[in-house]
From Swiss-Prot:
PANTHER family the record matches: IMIDAZOLE GLYCEROL PHOSPHATE SYNTHASE HISHF (PTHR21235:SF2), IMIDAZOLE GLYCEROL PHOSPHATE SYNTHASE SUBUNIT HISF/H IGP SYNTHASE SUBUNIT HISF/H (PTHR21235)
Gene name for this UniProt entry: hisF
Subunit-structure text: Heterodimer of HisH and HisF.
Keyword Ligase attached: no
Lineage: Bacteria, Pseudomonadati, Pseudomonadota, Gammaproteobacteria, Alteromonadales
The protein, known as: Imidazole glycerol phosphate synthase subunit HisF
Organism of provenance: Shewanella woodyi (strain ATCC 51908 / MS32)
Length: 257
């Protein structure tokens, strides 16, 4: 088994790290750079930063904090938020990001994925997918502009179909953000993640629902994901990353130490 990755997620809004529940009611957690440094020191394998309102407000990530993060940490990090062109992606990579993630802009223009891959290589192109389980139709659907509840909208895509589409177009990784589980700390959506794992040939990162160390163990053992992303359990000090890695090792799940 390849080493599994533990990835703290930092949602950014107006220059601060925030956290909501099911993509709503965000509260301020802290400052970007100190939190990034803390997680790097605690043993995170990489970090993901989402400027959650950038796409909905038709702007792009603030490059100033990207460069400050790059100066402080020595682990890979990925940035997302409003990146809709080669030039914007190039700027963020030049300021120190190791990967760029695209979500809503790719839904608006799927050809963006291929263009980014052609320019920078598959290895640094991550696609974020905000997936919502619709009980009425018993289906998983993709939503767009989820960082601003007033702008959030449904798309034409079923989650499985969009996962297949973004792979065809050249993404290097997929982060599956399960909206129903987000922030409630009741566990990852193992059923949905297992379904997506079957059709996902690139690294798959689980996002949404972590509340205990056992939840991480289950998502690696049952859903076979490559990495687990979490926010509130790390922000609130519920789980220490080094202790989590020790726990996973005791259950024969390798991580990077």
């Amino acid at each position: 088994m390849l080493a599994k990755r533990i990835v703290p997620c930092l949602d950014v809004r107006e220059g601060k790290v925030v956290k909501g529940v099911q993509f709503r009611n965000h509260e301020i957690v802290g400052d970007i750079v100190p939190l990034a440094a803390r997680y790097a020191e605690e043993g995170a394998d990489e970090l993901v930063f989402y400027d959650i309102t950038a796409s909905a407000h038709d702007r792009v990530i603030d490059k100033s904090w990207v460069s400050r993060v790059a100066e402080r940490i020595d682990i890979p990090f990925c940035v997302a938020g409003g990146i809709s062109s080669i030039e914007q992606a190039r700027e963020k990579l030049a300021f120190g990001a190791d990967k760029i993630s695209v979500n809503s802009p790719a839904l608006s223009d799927p050809s963006l994925i291929q263009r980014l891959q052609d320019e920078f290589g598959r290895q640094c192109i991550v696609i974020g997918i905000d997936s919502y389980y619709d009980e009425a139709s018993d289906s998983y659907r993709v939503k767009q502009f989820t960082g601003d509840e007033s702008a959030t909208k449904d798309t034409q895509w079923f989650t499985q179909n969009w996962v297949e589409e973004v792979q065809k177009r050249g993404c290097g990784e997929i982060v599956l953000n399960v909206m129903n589980q987000d922030g409630v700390r009741q566990g990852y959506d193992l059923k949905q993640l297992s379904i997506i794992r079957e059709i996902c040939d690139v690294p798959l990162i689980a996002s949404g629902g972590a509340g205990t160390m056992e939840h991480f163990k289950d998502v690696f053992e049952i859903a076979k994901v490559d990495a687990a992303l979490a926010a509130s359990v790390f922000h609130k000090g519920i789980i220490d990353i080094n202790e989590l890695k020790t726990y996973l090792a005791q259950h024969k799940i390798p991580t990077r130490r």
